[in-house]
């Protein structure tokens, strides 16, 4: 029976996220991740077929973290929910600047299959606006779009 891998896929994804935090997205490569884990690049490429696959795993991790911030904010009871979403978005940018850039400011050309960080939370945002202002879904979507663009 072959030995169990000492470095798990989750560890590699977390190390890749740390590399991005420290060096930005341009610093993400197999050697940097391996150095972070104190190993060769072999575990990276045995768990991920390409660096793009590893990047996608980091995007998924960052999306989950962002979604948890939006939905589990400690400010939820102090402010209207829609305001909390904006506050958490800004807080995320301040606390995780390189992850924020990687998640929201990356080149998305040819990346049609990836979900945006907001795709999971958007229905809740629109519903919150509809309920708070007693407006139609279309009006809530337009308000959100205009707030997003101009604020």
Predicted segments, located by residue:
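Hydrophobic alpha-helical connector segments
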Residues: 71-98, 143-147
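Alpha-helical DNA-contacting segments of helix-turn-helix folds
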Residues: 20, 53-62, 70, 103, ...
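Amphipathic alpha-helical segments used for helix-helix packing
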Residues: 92-112
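N-terminal intrinsically disordered/low-complexity leader segments
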Residues: 1-7
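Amphipathic alpha-helical packing segments from all-alpha helical-bundle domains
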Residues: 110-134, 141-146
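Amphipathic alpha-helical linker/stalk segments
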Residues: 56, 60-84, 121-131
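Helix-turn-helix
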Residues: 11, 15, 19-53, 57
């Amino acid at each position: 029976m072959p030995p169990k891998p000492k470095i798990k896929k989750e560890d590699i994804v977390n190390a890749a996220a740390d590399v991005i935090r420290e060096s930005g997205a341009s610093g993400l490569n197999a050697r940097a991740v391996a150095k972070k884990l104190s190993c060769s690049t072999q575990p990276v490429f045995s768990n991920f077929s390409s660096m793009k696959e590893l990047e996608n795993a980091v995007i998924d991790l960052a999306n989950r973290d962002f979604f948890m911030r939006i939905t589990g904010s400690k400010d939820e009871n102090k402010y209207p929910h829609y305001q909390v979403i904006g506050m958490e978005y800004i807080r995320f940018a301040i606390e995780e600047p390189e992850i924020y850039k990687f998640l929201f400011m990356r080149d998305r050309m040819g990346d049609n299959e990836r979900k945006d960080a907001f795709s999971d939370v958007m229905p809740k945002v629109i519903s919150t606006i509809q309920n708070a202002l007693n407006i139609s879904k279309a009006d809530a979507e337009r308000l959100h779009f205009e707030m997003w663009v101009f604020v």
